[in-house]
Curated annotation (Swiss-Prot):
It holds the Pfam family CoaE. Signal peptide: none annotated. GO terms for biological process: coenzyme A biosynthetic process. The gene is coaE. GO terms for molecular function: ATP binding; dephospho-CoA kinase activity. Belongs to the CoaE family. Pathway: Cofactor biosynthesis; coenzyme A biosynthesis; CoA from (R)-pantothenate: step 5/5. Gene3D superfamilies: P-loop containing nucleotide triphosphate hydrolases (3.40.50.300). The lineage of its organism: Bacteria, Pseudomonadati, Campylobacterota, Epsilonproteobacteria, Campylobacterales. Its EC number is 2.7.1.24. The keyword Nucleotide-binding applies. This is Dephospho-CoA kinase. GO terms for cellular component: cytoplasm. Its main location: cytoplasm. It is an enzyme of class 2 (transferase).
Amino acid sequence: MILKNAIALTGGIGTGKSTTLKILESQGYKILDADKIAHQLLQEHRLEIAQRFGSDILEKDILNRKKLGAIVFQNANELKWLEDFLHPLIRECMLKKACELEKNHQAYFLDIPLFFEVGGKKRYPVSRVVLIYAPRALQIERLLERDKLKEAEILQRLACQMDIEQKRAMSDYIIDNSSSLKDLNKQVERFLKTLL
């Protein structure tokens, strides 16, 4: 199966994927969001996950993602367990929804932050991979401001993702988001013209 109308959108934390997705949505493009699906799956499978990580991650029968994150981002084995549990479920859900969107014969986007980490085009047979790029120093600066995390926490989270420069080398198209919102809009427009 090849998803000929699907374009994978990826990037690291703090590169501007969310802003780019808002621009694409405002232009009428359909987006399949791996993170939203992951959040739904975390809730659906919260009891299984709590068996692994302890009932402290549940509050009134709702999984507290911050508490779970505090555990998994400090322990590579626990993060691997969670990813091994979730990623096949996310993929199944994404591909099912993508097959429906293929029927429209129009370009759409799969927002998969960990696209390369989970197997890239072997796991998600898309037509193109677009990277939203910002250099690592800018990622850190944005995360310090946006998420109010300590630099050590940011570095820990960045270490869990493939280096942004590696992703850049593996992508089919780069949207450089190291400047202004106005420039990002121009770059998105330039990319969209390649779809015509």
